[in-house]
């Protein structure tokens, strides 16, 4: 038996007692397709990498809300593709829900920071990149990622992610990119549009256009399922407001301490 050190401690312990050239790190709520290991081997044979990761998607058996949340977390129109989409607005940082890394690199970097409650995987990926190691996105190395089953749970999850981004910015100021600020800008923008719309109702059209974009894109991705399309709009707003408010609150607390 080992003491419960959370996900980071467990992963670090597993890495220390492991053997082999590469480590595969996965979340407990992920399901692997049958071809996962074959895809990893094929991708590494084609392109060498010190660390790599792949996208996550929804399994056909997932319920409607899980599929909607999966859309919100992976769509280019909500995340800029930074979670592993083929289109992305930022350098690729492997995430712990689907990550591979050379064992010697993991040991040399001392693994995950066990003092961090949230954002420890981005912290680790940042140290990988700053250490001069290569990271690669392997689109074929995907996992089915089970999501929350309630929007309030999802809100709290992404709220913590927004807070973690500010904690990471304090450690690595140069890692904060425009794409990370977009949810906060979205929150302020939506509130501003709602207030200004009282005087100029046509401004609501801007918000409506974004809603329609999300609805059409999500409905198309889920083969014409209108219900999932509607839920995806709700999930997208939950994701953006959760991350955005967490980001703003953590930023405000940080600035007040200065």
Q: What is the predicted role of each segment?
A:
Residues 54-60, 69-92, 107, 171:
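Short, flexible, basic/aromatic active-site loop/helix in glycosyltransferases
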Residues 27-31:
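The conserved acidic donor/metal-binding loop of glycosyltransferases
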Residues 34-67, 141-142, 146:
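Conserved donor NDP-sugar-binding/catalytic core segment of glycosyltransferases
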Residues 113-176:
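Catalytic donor/gating beta->alpha subdomain of glycosyltransferases that bind UDP-sugars
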Residues 2-18, 39, 89, 93-97:
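Glycine-rich, basic loop-to-helix element that forms the pyrophosphate-binding segment
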Residues 19-20, 98-109:
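Conserved nucleotide-sugar donor-binding
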Residues 23:
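Short aromatic/hydrophobic "clamp" motif used to bind/position activated sugar donors
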Residues 186-257:
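Membrane-embedded multi-pass helical conduit in multi-pass membrane proteins
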